[in-house]
Amino acid sequence: MAHCFFDMTIGGQPAGRIIMELFPDVPKTAENFRALCTGEKGIGPSGKKMTYEGSVFHRVIPKFMLQGGDFTLGNGRGGESIYGAKFADENFIHKHTTPGLLSMANAGPGTNGSQFFITTVATPHLDGKHVVFGKVVEGMDVVRKIEATQTDRGDKPLSEVKIAKCGQL
């Protein structure tokens, strides 16, 4: 099982490391995330380096989730996968049963790119709509720190929440 990490900053200050385990029974989805953590695929169709490094969590909703992974636009409207722009929902084996799950953000069926979210509570209403592909194994305290960040009315953090460094362990 692959393990990836995010070294996070909030408002430019180090906030700690989040370590995530990727599930083997969603191999295509997990591989997309892993490769975007390492940045090994180089420049993507958008002309941007295909990596989460330097990207932000653009949406934080307490008692729900933290969303990030838009490395092309940074506002939730962009992102791309290692397979091209978008890819299909792989399966819905895993359910949104606990905090700390890693799941794909999308704009409807078959629209997975690079955006993901980390749950901060169980979110069963997302089952069958979003592909769960991993879980936080260390650094839930960092997730809680991000969750507590003040946001504007559009759920955008007032202090920049950035993935300063990321990769595979």
Curated annotation (Swiss-Prot):
Reactions it catalyzes: [protein]-peptidylproline (omega=180) = [protein]-peptidylproline (omega=0)
Swiss-Prot/TrEMBL keywords: Cytoplasm, Isomerase, Rotamase
Record's keyword annotation contains Isomerase: yes
EC number(s) given by UniProt: 5.2.1.8
Recorded GO MF terms: cyclosporin A binding; peptidyl-prolyl cis-trans isomerase activity
Top-rank taxon: Eukaryota
PPIase cyclophilin-type domain: residues covered: 5-168
Gene Ontology terms describing biological process: protein folding
Keyword Transcription regulation tagged: no
GO cellular component, one term: cytoplasm
Subcellular location: Cytoplasm
One Pfam family per UniProt: Pro_isomerase
Activity: how regulated: Binds cyclosporin A (CsA). CsA mediates some of its effects via an inhibitory action on PPIase.
Family: Belongs to the cyclophilin-type PPIase family.
Summary of the function given for this chain in its UniProt record: PPIases accelerate the folding of proteins. It catalyzes the cis-trans isomerization of proline imidic peptide bonds in oligopeptides.
Protein name per UniProt: Peptidyl-prolyl cis-trans isomerase
Source organism: Unspecified eudicot DB-1992
Lineage of source species: Eukaryota, Viridiplantae, Streptophyta, Embryophyta, Tracheophyta
